[in-house]
Amino acid sequence: WRATDEAQTGMTHDRAGVRIDRMIEGIKVLRGLWGDDAFSLEGNHYTITEMNGMPKPVQAGGPPIIVGGGGKRVLSTAARMADIVGVHPNVVEGVISPEAIKSMSSEATEEKLGWVRDAAGDRFDDIEISILKLVTIVTDGRDAVSEKVGGGMGMDAATILASPTHWWARPNRSSKNSSSNASGGRVPT
């Protein structure tokens, strides 16, 4: 998902639409090869002709597929095709930009979960939601630390404290307090 990852592997960093189209075909290939019969697909990125993938997965339907992203198209696709949907910053150009940072707010995360819910329809309750935690800090001084973290990310302290991607824990407290943020540690639904 990052341009540096693709550069290090010699891959071309295609535009987001091409990467999403390739992922959709890739998921179709995996699911097809995990099926009981020979599988064929004539796509723009993959061509499979009467291949019966072996060995077959032990788990019916194959292992769970996780698809993560931060944009509407990839999250909507994930909601329709994946078993686990990862809700992440919107990294359009393969770099963590100021816009990507802003897409980690509580409000942006709620909007993304709405896209997933809308696209998933009746299967929403069967999908596992995963949210990337970018910052975990154990401190008794969360307000001061949130100002410092927020300043480095172009966000104010209140936005950092409310963000589901940043969690706060107080040292030497019971475990029930070890994973809560300003919004009570709940993922917005």
Question: What annotation goes with each model-predicted range?
Answer:
Residues 1-189:
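Active-site-adjacent structural elements that line small-molecule/cofactor binding pockets in enzymes
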